[in-house]
Amino acid sequence: MLKQRTLKNPIRATGVGLHTGKPIQLTLLPAPADFGIVFRRVDLNPPVEIPANPYNVGETTLSTCLIKGDVRVSTVEHLMSAMAGLGVDNAVIELDSAEIPIMDGSAGPFVFLIQSAGVLEQDAPKKFLRVKKEVTLRDGDKYASFTPFDGFKVNFSIEFDHPVFRDRRPQTEVEFSTASFVKEVSRARTFGFMHEIEYLRSKGLAQGGSMANAIVVGEYRILNEDGLRFEDEFVKHKILDAIGDLYMLGHGLLADFRAHKSGHSLNNRALRLLLEQKDAWEWVTFEDEQPVPIDYLRPLAVA
């Protein structure tokens, strides 16, 4: 049986908020089977819990933000992507701020945290949403689609009219597994244009943004001294974001997800559209000895 997973031990980290620029303390805690992933704001009295759920996603302009009443937790997508990558189904994420720390702008530090905590199998089957027929959402020249696939594959393409992007690969595809996620996707950093960052700062946002946690693109070139971590880092980060946004489902997907110029909003709206079309999908588990279509590292290897 392919089992659900949680963290073996609690683990704590500190980082800086992308928008506030202030220190944030983050604690990842184990949770029981069928609990899901829940964010807990411990800076509030009483603490407020917001489950990771596509219908709790509110603001998506600069990141994926979970909202419950007037309480929010933003920039959750990189941590959610790491949870998906290591197959964690159940966890409590405590934080003392309205945003998850940006760390280095990728999911790499969160992968390291989860690996350091260890991963524990639970006595309950891991659930997947298996897509049975195509569901596509179009918005002008952008689109996001789900088609049937025996596994989870993400194909993403981007388009920017800018010198830095003209000679780089605008499209790439990753067949999801723990190994491919950690090696090919997790270290891809978020990116932004210098003029946009300056504008955001003038509005009191992106106070914690720097070349230590983002690829900064100037008028003609990448401004980071050490350049890119790999040639297709821009589009790989879009795949990282999409994996995190789609993991708001709370379960793994068995589908071929293809997107062009998609972002947090379109990813979320496409996921909601899929859920609304109940004849397009089904829940499945792998409780016998049948082959499992996604290769997760064994917990001993993860730990």
UniProtKB/Swiss-Prot annotation:
- What does the record give as EC number? 3.5.1.108
Residues forming the catalytic site: 264
Gene Ontology cellular-component terms for this entry are: membrane
Q: Which cofactor does it need?
A: Zn(2+)
- InterPro entries per UniProt: Ribosomal_Su5_D2-typ_SF (IPR020568), UDP-acyl_GlcNac_deAcase (IPR004463), UDP-acyl_GlcNac_deAcase_C (IPR011334), UDP-acyl_N-AcGlcN_deAcase_N (IPR015870)
Biochemical pathway: Glycolipid biosynthesis; lipid IV(A) biosynthesis; lipid IV(A) from (3R)-3-hydroxytetradecanoyl-[acyl-carrier-protein] and UDP-N-acetyl-alpha-D-glucosamine: step 2/6
Alphabetized Pfam families for the sequence? LpxC (PF03331)
Q: Which UniProt keywords apply?
A: Hydrolase, Lipid A biosynthesis, Lipid biosynthesis, Lipid metabolism, Metal-binding, Zinc
GO BP term, pick one: lipid A biosynthetic process
Amino acids binding Zn(2+) = 78, 237, 241
Which Gene3D superfamilies does this entry report, sorted A to Z?
Answer: lpxc deacetylase, domain 1, lpxc deacetylase, domain 2
Provide a Gene Ontology MF annotation, just one: UDP-3-O-acyl-N-acetylglucosamine deacetylase activity
Asked if the keyword Transferase belongs to this entry, the reply reads no
**Cleavable signal peptide:** none
- Catalyzed reactions: a UDP-3-O-[(3R)-3-hydroxyacyl]-N-acetyl-alpha-D-glucosamine + H2O = a UDP-3-O-[(3R)-3-hydroxyacyl]-alpha-D-glucosamine + acetate
Function, as annotated: Catalyzes the hydrolysis of UDP-3-O-myristoyl-N-acetylglucosamine to form UDP-3-O-myristoylglucosamine and acetate, the committed step in lipid A biosynthesis.
Q: Which family does it belong to?
A: Belongs to the LpxC family.
Q: Kindly give the NCBIfam families that the UniProt entry links to this protein.
A: lpxC
Q: What is this protein called?
A: UDP-3-O-acyl-N-acetylglucosamine deacetylase
Tell me what organism the protein belongs to.
Cellvibrio japonicus (strain Ueda107) (Pseudomonas fluorescens subsp. cellulosa)
